[in-house]
From Swiss-Prot:
Keywords: Arsenical resistance, ATP-binding, Nucleotide-binding, Translocase
Alphabetical list of InterPro entries matching this protein: Anion-transp_ATPase-like_dom, ArsA_HSP20-like, ATPase_ArsA/GET3, HSP20-like_chaperone, P-loop_NTPase
Chemical reaction(s) catalysed: arsenite(in) + ATP + H2O = arsenite(out) + ADP + phosphate + H(+)
Domain of life: Bacteria
Xref: Pfam families: ArsA_ATPase, ArsA_HSP20
Keyword ATP-binding in annotation: yes
Chain's role: Anion-transporting ATPase. Catalyzes the extrusion of arsenite.
Enzyme class: translocase
Record organism: Chlorobaculum tepidum (strain ATCC 49652 / DSM 12025 / NBRC 103806 / TLS)
Keyword Ribosomal protein belongs to the record: no
Protein name according to UniProt: Putative arsenical pump-driving ATPase
Taxonomic classification: Bacteria, Pseudomonadati, Chlorobiota, Chlorobiia, Chlorobiales
GO MF: ATP binding; ATP hydrolysis activity; ATPase-coupled arsenite transmembrane transporter activity
Family according to the record: Belongs to the arsA ATPase family.
Length: 405
């Protein structure tokens, strides 16, 4: 299943672009689902059709859905929520407050992500278009698998080696202890969610099937936010294959009051094309009417893609590479707009940590690099190069063997 994720600053028109892309995919024979994770529910407005928490048919080959996070939360977390609510209420916390305390930050977005795996496994669709919330929320959404990975491992180990083996013996010792032992279905729910989250990470970072497309306007704030988004998306291993600049005024038409705005847009457009190169930049005009309903979206889709299949790969370069040159192994990350001063790199065990500001990526290293300290990272041509000298590792290994002898 081809997955296309659209994101951008609020108000740039990403929902219209997402909906138009889905319409064009369906016209080309792809069984398409467009899914909105934006709580604003703009997708219903775009199609001018009321959408619900399950896929609604728009036309042939096209369904749409607006995720209701509370429905998903109840389906996936009910047994866990019930257990913790009981514990909190035993400590004197009121029922409503106890319910709220069982929902961890990011849980609503997490269960929106889990739908992706389920739709992929069902095999009902050829293409999935994700219409996401504004950039900041999207980055939090897409980075959840990485952000929670360490905690997932810890909780799963606690469940496997402590909770499961001890729950039955301890529950038999006294009723008070038994009261605090989590039921089997709650433990299984936690394990299942964490397992699926690992699968989601693999699906979204599959650079053959899944890409992100950035929607922006030719305005300073929109450009800056899109630059940050591209940097962080690349950091987390998401391939970006296209930039769409929306709501451009006609540079040829004399528009009086808007003449100054046209000049501003043309100036920023040059900066966008230069700064985001070699990514393809698609320029989209400002329409003289609202883009609402399937007919309007069909016209918009043709302006975006023409006769091109939207499911095609518009730019094909992975954001993370492992390159070996002689005895030097390099981990390379494409970080187009990162400030080298803000980048921090370190290794713990078999994991490479790369941090930019408050965003952190954990990369599992090949076995041959485990325990080897990285050399000095170099930022060159929009790529961060992190070297590992295999010869030094060999010398270190030989020294250890000699000392043992």
């Amino acid at each position: 299943m081809r997955i296309l994720t659209f994101t951008g600053k609020g108000g740039v028109g990403k929902t219209s672009v997402s909906a138009a892309t889905a319409v064009r995919l369906s016209e080309m024979g792809h069984r398409t689902l467009v899914l909105s994770t934006d709580p604003a529910h703009s997708l219903s407005d775009s199609f001018n059709i009321q959408l619900g928490a399950e896929p609604t048919k728009i036309k042939e080959n096209l369904h749409a859905i607006e995720v209701n996070p509370y429905v998903d939360l109840k389906q996936n977390w009910h047994s866990v929520q019930k257990y913790y609510t009981r514990i909190f209420m035993a400590q004197g916390v009121s029922g409503v407050m106890a319910d709220e305390m069982t929902i961890l930050p990011g849980m609503e977005e997490l269960f929106s992500l889990l739908r992706i795996k389920r739709y992929k496994s069902a095999g009902l669709y050829d293409a999935l278009v994700l219409d996401t919330a504004p950039t900041g929320e999207t980055l939090r959404l897409l980075s959840l698998p990485d952000t929670l990975s360490w905690g997932m491992k810890a909780v799963k180990n606690v469940n496997k080696y402590i909770v499961r083996p001890l729950s039955k013996p301890l529950s038999k010792m006294s009723d008070k202890i038994a009261y605090y032992i989590p039921p089997e279905d709650a433990i299984e729910s936690v394990d299942q969610v964490f397992d699926e989250l690992e699968d989601i990470r693999e699906i979204l970072t599959d650079n053959v099937k899944s890409t992100v497309r950035l929607v922006m306007n030719a305005e300073k704030m929109s450009i800056k936010e899109t630059m940050r988004a591209l940097t962080y998306l690349n950091l987390y291993g998401f391939k970006v294959d296209m930039v769409l600049v929306n709501k451009l005024l006609d540079a040829q038409e004399n528009s009086g009051y808007l003449e100054k705005w046209k000049g501003i847009q043309q100036k920023y457009l040059g900066e966008i094309e230069e700064g985001f190169s070699p990514l393809p930049v698609k320029k989209l005009k400002m329409y003289d009417q609202e883009i609402v309903g399937v007919k309007s979206l069909e016209v918009f889709a043709h302006d975006i893609y023409g006769d091109t299949d939207p499911s095609g790969m518009m730019y094909d370069e992975p954001p993370i590479k492992f390159v070996r040159q002689g005895d030097v192994y390099e981990v390379q990350l494409k970080l187009m707009f990162a400030n080298p001063v803000d980048i921090d790199v370190w290794v713990t065990g078999d994991e490479l940590f790369v941090q930019i500001g408050n965003q952190r990526k954990i990369i599992t290293l090949p076995v041959s690099l485990t325990g080897l300290e990285p050399g000095d990272a170099v930022f060159k041509d929009k790529w961060l190069h992190i070297p590992f000298d295999l010869e030094k590792q060999g010398q270190h290994h030989r020294t250890r063997e000699y000392n043992k002898a």
